[in-house]
Amino acid sequence: MMINEQIRAREVRLVGANGDQLGIKSRNDALDLAANLNLDLVLVAPNAKPPVCRIMDYGKFRFEQQKKEKEQRKNQKVISMKEVRLSPTIDEHDFNTKLRNAIKFLEKGDKVKASIRFKGRAITHKEIGQRVLDRFSEACAEVSTVESKPKMEGRSMFLVLAPKNDK
């Protein structure tokens, strides 16, 4: 953003400190007006014909802008990915424990990656792993939506569940 002497246009459309239109003035007249008010001349619309400048306290303006940006960054929610590891031959109790953990993560707003690692000859029975992941996603259906269907990657199969937005 250009201020004061950085502005190169000969004529500018001037907006006063309180937002009122002051018309088209020469750059020097606008600079003198801003200096008399102990404020800065700030170029707000460089592509307009003639460019639009506003008389304001630039330091205060920058401070307000930075405050808004900081507030926006603070309000952004960071979604993290939690992983739950299952096996193709998982026992019922272990399955329920993993399921409870996954539901807890989803309720907190995190995504859950459920993965099954096939060891040894178990890779020949991918359909068993597929059934376990399908059962897992159905059990989490109340609090989640399937973001990516079960798919193989190397020796492991995984699916990603995202929390449901009930707002």
Curated annotation (Swiss-Prot):
Keywords: Cytoplasm, Initiation factor, Protein biosynthesis. The keyword Acyltransferase does not apply. InterPro entries: T_IF-3_C_sf, T_IF-3_N_sf, Translation_initiation_fac3_CS, Translation_initiation_fac_3, Translation_initiation_fac_3_C, Translation_initiation_fac_3_N. It holds the Pfam family IF3_N. GO terms for molecular function: ribosome binding; translation initiation factor activity. One of its GO terms (cellular component) is cytosol. It is found in: Cytoplasm. One of its GO terms (biological process) is ribosome disassembly. Signal peptide: none annotated. Monomer. IF-3 binds to the 30S ribosomal subunit and shifts the equilibrium between 70S ribosomes and their 50S and 30S subunits in favor of the free subunits, thus enhancing the availability of 30S subunits on which protein synthesis initiation begins. Belongs to the IF-3 family. This is Translation initiation factor IF-3. It comes from Bacillus cereus (strain ATCC 14579 / DSM 31 / CCUG 7414 / JCM 2152 / NBRC 15305 / NCIMB 9373 / NCTC 2599 / NRRL B-3711).
